[in-house]
């Protein structure tokens, strides 16, 4: 039951663009995890740049830097 939570700066993506990105992400999990399409979910959460550190970096990224599969190229 993989769930992908994409947190990002505002991009003004259309619903069609979100659907395409979600389908692409789901395809990767289906390929590498063997997941079925019905078991996958994808969320898009826009975070304002000035809120990124408080809402994403400090509570989610920073505490897990040692275990992240892909680390960011920035820090605060």
UniProtKB/Swiss-Prot annotation:
It is found in: Cytoplasm. It comes from the Bacteria. Its main location: cytoplasm. Keywords: Cytoplasm, Isomerase. GO terms for cellular component: cytoplasm. It is an enzyme of class 5 (isomerase). Pfam families: Tautomerase. SUPFAM superfamilies: Tautomerase/MIF (SSF55331). The active site is at residue 2. GO terms for molecular function: intramolecular oxidoreductase activity, interconverting keto- and enol-groups. Its EC number is 5.3.2.-. Homodimer. NCBIfam families: PRK01271.1. Belongs to the 4-oxalocrotonate tautomerase family. PptA subfamily. This is Tautomerase PptA.
